[in-house]
Amino acid sequence: MGFQVSPGVEVKEIDLTGIIPTLSTSTGACVGQFTWGPVNYRTLIDQETKLYNTFGKPETNTYVSFFTAANFLAYGNNLRVVRVANSASNNAVSGGNTNALLIANEQIYEQTYYTGAGTFGEFAARYPGAKGNSLKVSVCGSRTAYASNASAQAVLLGGSLNTANHVIGDAKTGNTKIFLNGSANTHVKAGDWIHFGNTSRGTKYKVTFANLTMYTFTPALTANVAANTVIQRQWEYYDQFDGAPGTSSYVLNKFGKNDELHLIVVDENGLFTGVPGTVLEKYSHASKASDNKDDTGTSKYYPKVLFEQSKYIYWGDHDTNGTNWGSEALNTTFTDVSLPRRLSLNGGTDQVVTAGALQLGWDLFANADVVDASLLMAGDADLTLSNYIIQSVAEVRKDAVAFVSPPRSVCVNNIGSEADDVVLYRNGTVDENGDVVTAGLTSSSYGFMDSGWKYQYDKYNDTYRFLPLNGDMAGLCARTDKTRDPWFSPGGFNRGQIKNVVRMSWNPGQTERDVLYTSGVNPVVSFPGEGTILYGDKTLQTKPSAFDRINVRRLFIILEKAIARAAKYSLFEFNDEFTRAQFVSMVDPFLRDIQGRRGIFDYRVVCDTTNNTGEVIDSNRFIGDIYIKPARSINFILLNFVAVRTGVSFDEVVGKF
């Protein structure tokens, strides 16, 4: 305690209740190509519905990534997904194909485009990809744009302007086109609703095309329209809102006016919902004033509203017909634009994902201090990427296992050669001189390989597809964590049942299983009446040891991660008897609990002067030695049946054979 120089009471609180924390070991990680969603950003997904809503429908180039993630979610509910994209992929924009660009995620947009550089037009799709070309944005920036009267204009009969006998007169029943004679059309836009006459009652017509001299509409006229008839127009989406935009109370109190606007986002081509024209989002009474906030302090400035709330678009620039948009409210009059904006986005593209992009995506999981991920699913990764995930992610983290599958070519429609080719893929090949011709998968206790692909129904496209099993393998581990503990083997008839299998690409028999298992490949086998089973629990470690089994590897991941996390609170304390005893009293109950849950046979914790010598203390180090006898899973069962004569005592023969 500090030295007090006058009487007083000083209260101190010392916390000596430190324990080993509980850790999650069921967090999956998946990197792949998708049709929609943020790029190079870790997104938490807890169910398949959210996966679909966030990353879009599985398609030809994306279904493997989608179902690898979806298959994991059939067993677990904690998955981090990273979408990767080719650097040549673009977001759809309202400024035309030549302005298309890649905005990978919210961070990139906020750092580069949020200030309104105006390099891509007024709006951009939230994420890159051709799917963004289905989006349409309509903005109603004033009361006039919401609804207005077009001035009386002479109308011509529907038909072709090249026809010589057009005269000023009535538009007849059945016409779907009107030519304007006199003042040019500056009041009606494609998409608007129109009525003829001084009333909004009666038949309503949808304008499908409009220019300065003519517009077409649907349905056809149900009655004659006389020349010089007044046209009543309404914004295309007027009925989606409670009234016209005007002046917000915030701006009114700042002596400004005309700051409100309505904005709506539509699935124009139906790629998001399957129904063209479906309204996706609408924003009512948003503001053009950059400082406008509601009573709760939430911004109403429409670029910020879109940034914080929209799932489909970003703002890029203001309507060029407006003035003062984006200014602060004080004494500001915002332009009363006469017509709404109707902007179809285009220029969005998808490109084939490169190996480099996939590796960069996996780099987002390499730092164990930044993100928690225990089960890494490789999808249809090739040999190079599979080794990268094992060596540069799992082994660097030291708290995760990478699950890989053989390539489709060696286990689908490769009848009779599957086992040999899978083993060649796993081990690589050498020539007659012993020189390596092709490298195989690295030897590592942080890697796990299955034997094939499964045939599965794709409900989104009403078809069947072959899919790698590594998503299911990781899922079995997540389910084992939930039903038992991480140190239980995920294989076998009790915990190794695989879901959503129509059939396997091949079904290894006993001889083939022997070939696979000796090379560290875990067979997946369909048994009549039993289902499809993971029939192994080996890691990719070639060296025979306890760590060539996944349950032991995951046991030590738990022990190392949990104890290390608790031990960091001993940093900068004194290496004395008290600190060492505190460490032992924290670790011992944790290991005793795991022993009681069948994870270890026995253990010992040594943290005293035998390993914390004077030299160790003087070098500012602290050593705790933890000895573990891990529990082993049963891989082989031998049943001996011995026939004994009636007169022979069992004591004479037991243990003799």
Placement of each model-derived feature along the sequence:
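Surface-exposed loop/edge segments in extracytoplasmic proteins
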Residues: 201-205, 271-280
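Surface-exposed interaction regions enriched in Ser/Thr/Asp/Glu
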Residues: 224-235, 255, 262
